[in-house]
Amino acid sequence: HLIDNIRKNYNVPEYLVSKEASVQSVADNANQYGFWKSDATDSNQKTWIGIPLWVHRRCLKPMFTIANQIAYNNKMVLPSNITKVGKTGWYDVKGNAVQKQFVKEHGEKVVGLLADDWIEAIKEGKNEPSSFVISPFSAVQQQIKRMLKQRLPARIDIQRSKVNQWIDKSIGTVHTFQGKEAQKVYFVIGTDNTQDGAVNWSCEKPNLLNVAVTRAKKEFYVIGDMQRIQSKPFYETIFKERNVK
């Protein structure tokens, strides 16, 4: 890996430069105040969490509650002045994967939801909706982008170039959205019942789901096979905390 080779050449520690490193993890390691968090799947592994993360201001509950449970051992606190409650739900959509982990039915669901978001945003006098579509898998986000560019402009009667520009910045993999936020996030798991290994990869550690959930300020929705995935690590917390059924 190119980054790893550069890191080794300059004798930079792995915790500062790696695929797993983020601005947040570097900031945590630079902070002398904090606590050691045990890994949810391996109690022998611990991660240093810096004290600024103890107070969380981006997300409403239940997103805050989900992140707190899966990634922070319930150590985070929400400021007392944040009393509103957001929405978390799970759209139970099944189908067969047609392009790696991409399920056409998931894409069709996203088209309908985003068409509604655009119509609502325009009614409210906004230029565009504050919505992200995030997936663990590159193939899923690529195919959803393609489907949206084909179908969404006609659904909402907006100039195609404007819609395409919005699609390019609002749909992507989890890693491309680190540090960003939106009012609403749709998390598209993808995969069918022959690809359980791919789903298991997405929840090996809480990091990926934690980033996805905490992009959403007010609303977070999972799109995927509920029966197959709801009991898997960390997904079970999202399923349990959903308040839109």
Name each model-derived stretch:
Residues 1-245:
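Conserved helicase motor core of SF1/SF2 NTP-dependent helicases
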